Structures are given as C-alpha cells and as structure tokens.
Amino acid sequence: MALRKGGLALALLLLSWVALGPRSLEGAEPGTPGEAEGPACPATCACSYDDEVNELSVFCSSRNLTRLPDGIPGGTQALWLDSNNLSSIPPAAFRNLSSLAFLNLQGGQLGSLEPQALLGLENLCHLHLERNQLRSLAVGTFAYTPALALLGLSNNRLSRLEDGLFEGLGNLWDLNLGWNSLAVLPDAAFRGLGGLRELVLAGNRLAYLQPALFSGLAELRELDLSRNALRAIKANVFAQLPRLQKLYLDRNLIAAVAPGAFLGLKALRWLDLSHNRVAGLLEDTFPGLLGLRVLRLSHNAIASLRPRTFEDLHFLEELQLGHNRIRQLAERSFEGLGQLEVLTLDHNQLQEVKVGAFLGLTNVAVMNLSGNCLRNLPEQVFRGLGKLHSLHLEGSCLGRIRPHTFAGLSGLRRLFLKDNGLVGIEEQSLWGLAELLELDLTSNQLTHLPHQLFQGLGKLEYLLLSHNRLAELPADALGPLQRAFWLDVSHNRLEALPGSLLASLGRLRYLNLRNNSLRTFTPQPPGLERLWLEGNPWDCSCPLKALRDFALQNPSAVPRFVQAICEGDDCQPPVYTYNNITCASPPEVAGLDLRDLGEAHFAPC
C-alpha cells in the first residue's frame, strides 16, 4: 500500500525501530553476544539494545531461514523475520516472547498460519504478514493478540474471510487486506473492529458492497476500495461511517452512482471516483457532503454537467473532471463552489464554453482546459476569476486570440497557450494581465507579433516563442519586458534581430536562438548566463567578432555542449545537447566553429 493511504504510522514505526538506542550490535559477527548490559544475540541475527529504556530489537531479515532461529531473548520487543523462506510457524512458537510488540514476517513463503501460531503474544501491537502465500486464515488465529494496533495482510492469496476472524481486536487501528483475491466479503467480516481507523481493500476482486459490511466501524477514517471490480455504488452503503474522511473508489468499473450513495458521510474530506465508467452525475449524487475538500472524477465517461450537481459542496477546494466526454459548459455549471481553488477540465470534448460558465468561482487559482477543441473563446468568458494565477489552454484548437478574451484575469501569473495552431494574436489580447510572469506560446503558427502585444506585461519573466514561423521581431516588441529572465525564440525563421530588440532586457539570463536563419548577432545584454546558437547559418566575418570574443570569454554561458544529468539506476548512455556556432560563410571557414577561428581571421576588422 502506498504511504498516501495509511502508511505514515508504519513509516514512523520503522524509523523508530531502526534508530533504537545508543548501542547497536548489528555490526558484530553472527553469534557475537552484546555487551555485558545486553542479552545474547541469536547466531544468525543481529541485535540492537537500548539500555536506557531496556528495549531489544532482533534483526533476522534476509537470512534464508527455513525455521525460526533458536535463542531469541525473552525480552525482545521487536523481531524482524522478513524476506526469509519460512513456510510455516509452529504452534506456540513465540510463547516465550510475551514482551514482543513488533513482529515482521513479510516477504516469506507462509502458506498458512496455525491457529495457535501467535500464542503468547498478548502485547503484540504491530504484525506484518504482507507478501506471503496465505490463502486462508482460521477463526481464532488472532485470539492471542488482543493488543494489535496494525495488521498487514496485503499481497497474499486470500480469497475469503471467515465471519468473526478479527473478533477481539478492539484495539486495531489499521487493517491492510489489499492486493489479495477477495471477491465476496461476509456481512460480519469486520465484526469486533470498533476502533478501526484505516481499512485497505484495494487491489482485490470485489464486485459488490452490502450496507451491513461496514456496520460497527463508526471510528473508521480512511477506506480504500480502489482497483476492484465494483460496477455500481448503491444508496446508504456507507451510511454507518460517520467519521470517514477519505474514500478511495478509483480504478473500478463503476458506471452508476445511486442517489444517496454517500449519505451519512458528514466528515468526508476526500472522495476519489477517478478511472471508472461513470457516464453522468445526478443533482442528488453529492448531497450532504458539506465538508468535502477534494473530488476526483477524472478518467470517466461524463458527457455533461447538470445544473446544481455540486451546489452542496460549499467547501470543495479541488475538482478534477479531466479525461471525460464533456462537450459544453453551460452558464453557472459550477454554482456553489465558492471555495474551489483547482479545477481541471483537460482532455474532454469541449467545443463551447458559455459566458458565465465559471460564475461564482471567485477563489479558483488553477484552471486546466487543455486538450479540448475550443476553437474560440468568447470575450469576458473568464471574468470574475480575479484570483486565477495559472490557466492551461494547451492543445485547444484556438486558432486566434481576440481582444478581451482574458479580461478580468488581473491576478494571472502563468498562461499556457502551447500547441494551439495559433496564426494570430490581436494587439490588445494580453492587456490587463499586469501580474503575468510566464507566457508559453510554443508550437504554434505565428508569423508575426503586433508591436504592442506585450504592452503592460512589465512583470513577465518567462517568454516562450519557440517552434513558430516568426521571420522577424519588431524592434520595440520586447520593450515592456524589463524583468524578462528567460527568452526562447528557437525553431523559428528569424533572419536578423534588430539591434535594439534586447536593449531593455537588462535582467535577461537565458536566451535561446537555436535553429533560425540568423547570420549575425551581437551578444547583449552583458549578464547572459546561457546563450544557445546552434543551427544558424552564421556569417563568420567581421560583424561576428564580438560574438566570438563573448563566447571565448564566457565558456559557461556559451558551452560547446551540455550533458544531460542522469539520475537513478536505469541511466542510459549520456545525452549531449550541442551548441555549435558553425560558420556557413565566408567559404574559407565554412564548416568551422566560430570559436576556433584565430585572431588572424579577424585582423582586417
């Protein structure tokens, strides 16, 4: 199970045992006893003893053990037997370990547990049996471990649970049954678990949930039912879980959610229904979920949004609707979501967004509409979204950006318009975006930029214009961008840059001019930290001497190549990005790198 769903307690426990005490015997030779204050260590294990609190941990992990080691001290508090070849545990094998609080048996070959295998472990709090071969567990197996707080049974082969299997475990907080083969659960499967906080049933074969299944779990906070075979969620199935805060239903086969399916979940904060087959949402799908903060509905088959679907979700902060089949956003589609901060609608089939569709979303900070085919956006469509700071419109078939499209977005920081097939942006289209920091116009079909396109964008730091069809840039086009830090105009058709184009960009540090048709360039401003020049037909005559001198004096700013940083164990052969300044003329130096030309070549200059 991932740490997002209940693993935090386990992680903290593991750290505490690993860090036990000031005296560690793990580095001693096998069989070497501890110092005088500590008990002897089994020959095949290593031990860690903390004499301040009189706690002993015995580590017998990954020793190819086929039976339990002899001589485990009776006062052991933590015993690690994971990653061995134990196929069975004899009855009463731990009868002399009454102080044991932590037992790790995961990653072994256990096919079953004898009914009395855990006899004597009345103080055991954490039991890990994950990644074994367990097919069934007899009633009474856990009768000798009344203090259990965490029980890990994930990644076994359990196909059924007996009624009353967990009876008597009133102290259990965390039960992980994920990644087994459970297809049906009896009504009384969890009887006796009145104190349970987290229940993981992910990765099984459950196709049906009956309301009686969760009766008696009034303290449950987190329920993970992801990656099963559920086809529908019926009414009242969770009605007896008043304290549930997180419910994971993602990656099932859910096609229908009944009205009232989530009734009673007054404490619910997180609901994940993503990666299912939900085709529609009714107005009474989410009533009563007044505390819900996160709702994930991405990767379904939702074709439309009914009015008032979300009207009860007054405190919702994140709504994910990406990768559905929504074709239109009508006026007030999100009424009631006044606290929403993140809205994703990417990769739907949106062709039309009505003016007023986003009315009421006064707190939205991030909106993703990418991967649709909007073709055009009405003027004022984003009005009222004054707190929006990131707007994603990549791959949205926009074609043109008209004046007032972004009216009202006074707080916008990042605007992503990549891969839209844009052939034009009208001069006043970006006016009013005084707080904009990043503008991405990559991979469009722009042939020119209006003179005053960037008027009022005095805070812009990142401007990305690569992979367009720009043949020229007006001399005053970048004048307002006095805070520009990063400028990318690579992969265009630029033949020359006006001498004054970069004059006002005193803070520019990154400039990418690769793959254009430039023949000459005077490096400016002086503070450049990275300048990319590869892929241009450079005329290495006198006008280029200043560039040659700059490149030689600043090799880190104009590197000949950059090697990609490789991380992890699966590193491929090094990848190099080259930054050649290859001369196309005069003929006598064609094919040479500008930096390799000597002073004699420029003597006539």
From Swiss-Prot:
Disulfide bonds join C41-C47, C45-C60, C540-C583, C542-C605, C566-C571. LRR repeats lie at residues 75-96, 99-120, 123-144, 147-168, 171-192, 195-216, 219-240, 243-264, 267-288, 291-312, 315-336, 339-360, 363-384, 387-408, 411-432, 435-456, 459-480, 483-504, 507-528. One of its GO terms (biological process) is cell adhesion. GO terms for molecular function: insulin-like growth factor binding. It holds the Pfam family LRR_8. Residues 32-74 form the LRRNT domain. The keyword Hydrolase does not apply. It is found in: Secreted, Extracellular space. Residues 1-27 form the signal peptide. One of its GO terms (cellular component) is extracellular matrix. The keyword S-adenosyl-L-methionine does not apply. Transmembrane segments: none annotated. Glycans are attached at N64, N85, N96, N368, N515, N580. Forms a ternary complex with IGF1 and IGFBP3. Involved in protein-protein interactions that result in protein complexes, receptor-ligand binding or cell adhesion. This is Insulin-like growth factor-binding protein complex acid labile subunit. It comes from Papio hamadryas (Hamadryas baboon).
